[in-house]
Amino acid sequence: MKKMMHIRMGLTILMALTLLVLAACSNSSKAAVADTKTRVGIVLTEVGLGDRSFNDAAFNGLVKARDEKSIVFDYREPSKDLTAEAAFEEFSKEKFDLIIGLSNTVLTDMEKAAAKYPDQQFLLIDSQSALPNIASISFRAEEGSYLAGIIAGMASKENHVGFLGGMEIPALKDFEQGFKQGVLAVNPEAAVEAVYAGDFGNADLGKQLAQKMIQEQNVDVIYVAAGLTGVGALAEIQAQGKYAIGVDTDQFFLAEKAILTSMLKNIDVSIYNAVNSFIENKHTFPKKEIVEGLAENAVGLTGLHNITLSEEQQKTFDDLKTKISSGQTKITLNP
């Protein structure tokens, strides 16, 4: 009897050990799979997720790459408690394969980390750096903004349109200049007012600026490129019964009675493609600087709302778009 009990006890212990070994093997297998995935970190702008524009679009590009390709990713939202520099430092210490930063506003902080970790690969969106370990994606956003200007010039009844930008940085100055030249291409008598909020994350400020442009400057179409600040502006433009043009993503749902179109800067597509290229090229980029525009379908407009172009206007729009896309017409950008 005692012998049978010893046998049963031995079998129980053996089974328990077997299960532990199998579990350990399973965990090791999962860890091995995780180790083979490319690790990507992204540092957003201070506005963070929920801007329904720049940050959200970039984030969605990585979500798609995560869901369809062999990557895992994490993100940081700079704040009072976490600077962009500290966020880049964190990802670098954790040895992420690729660290992405958004816009010219994080350039200085990224360069500090890149200089400290020369073997770490970085990718900067909407700006460029001379450092060898910082690749970049820039957009000829002035081309898409030129198209937005054409629509604004055709839609304006007052011959007075506006541009409302977030911060006066080089990328947005390109937006402004492309927009102005598009307006004047179809409406040479129009005046174009440009206002910068100095903030991408203040919806109330956007509302105030839009109201001022409409009531004091008699602007009836405003191109808004201001992140969360722009969300407030769009709501106010609609409340005032005027027209707006959105940016980065299709913002029609934010002001359905006001939005004529949105200038798409396909950041999600460009980041998705860049990550795949990084993986395919064994964690390097074939080109240090990637610049994309209309010809690459990196920028463009959504469908039109609240406006119908005449046959003549549509022909004018198509002809001007072809000339910009082919390089026949050049947009002048002042430094």
Model-predicted regions and their roles:
Residues 25-335:
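A residue-level marker of the well-folded mature domains of exported/periplasmic proteins
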Residues 2-13:
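Bacterial N-terminal signal peptides that target proteins for export
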